[in-house]
A protein has these predicted regions:
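Conserved, single-site charged/polar hotspot
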Residues: 5-288
Length: 288
């Protein structure tokens, strides 16, 4: 097998702690939620605690004029804020959309409709992306390639949805994200063993596009979007037995798994699908 020289650079960013904001819901009229442990609701505008939350209890937030109301044991109570944060007070999870999430929830009243955002550390976010984007039963090295590609996409696209108040959606419009409910021991291992690793080209983190399958030959960015991204070239995608699913640019997920079965490691898979890239490690200050 072809040997590769793995060069890891250290990227420095001004922000001392990298978190990401993921849009879970927009333009909704009610938000059921809960926490796995005791928690609080704070007014994000004043940082004042407005409600204490019991563990494993169901609650609901609705818009009320320009602020919000919370349903507690069948009764609604006004919360004089248009921007609240729901957070466990110790290690625990928050729940909405019938899923558990790490980090905390932010709910905003925007013109009488609610937006729900999961504020979460980057690595915890990637733990919820890998099993949502790639079957957990696939090869570990394919999961590692997926983790690095997903992390690169996320970092390169921070602020992409800033007009909506968050960075990325939780859907394949950006990256599928299932929160802590989607996590498995195997996919978490892939994330942890590649912690902080991203793909760069010309000292910039790349938007590492990927799709389910390319149907035998991947496409270039100019083929699909008319933009020239030199690290996205057309290569045999090792998924000939799978019909094309998705845009076909960058890494084929089925192809990545097939290469892993042939003995390629995660980094070799990435260097096959993304050309002239360097592996870089995010500043460890992010993880303090």
């Amino acid at each position: 097998m072809k040997k590769i020289l793995l060069i890891i650079m250290l990227l420095f960013f001004a922000n001392p702690c990298l978190a990401i904001k993921i849009g879970l819901l927009t333009d909704t009229d009610n938000v059921p939620f809960g926490t796995s442990v005791f928690g609080t609701i704070t007014d994000a505008n004043t940082n004042r605690t407005v409600v204490d939350i019991e563990a494993m209890q169901g609650y609901e937030i609705k818009p009320y004029n320009n602020v919000m109301a919370i349903k507690i044991k069948g009764k609604y109570y006004k919360i004089n804020s248009d921007n609240i944060v729901i957070k466990p007070v110790s290690f625990g999870y928050v729940c909405t959309k019938s899923k558990w999430y790490r980090g905390f929830l932010r709910i905003q009243n925007k013109g009488g409709k609610l937006t729900v955002i999961n504020d979460v550390d980057l690595e915890d976010y990637i733990k919820g992306v890998v099993p949502a984007e790639m079957p957990s039963g696939w090869e570990l090295e394919a999961h590692k390639a997926q983790a690095v590609a997903a992390r690169s996409y996320a970092v390169a696209n921070l602020g992409k949805r800033a007009g909506l108040g968050f960075d990325l959606k939780d859907t394949p419009d950006d990256q599928a994200y299932g929160g802590a409910s989607a996590e498995t021991a195997k996919t978490n291992k892939a994330v942890e063993e590649t912690q902080g690793i991203v793909l760069t080209h010309d000292m910039k983190v790349i938007t590492a596009y990927y799709s389910a399958s390319a149907g035998g030959q991947s496409l270039t960015a100019s083929d699909v979007w008319g933009s020239n991204l030199p690290y996205l070239r057309s290569v045999p995608s090792f998924d000939d037995n799978i019909g094309k699913k998705g845009h076909g640019v960058g890494m084929s997920q089925h192809g990545a798994n097939n290469l892993a079965k042939q003995g390629y490691n995660g980094y070799q898979i990435l260097q096959y699908f993304y050309k002239d890239v360097t592996f870089a490690k995010l500043n460890p200050e992010y993880y303090k």
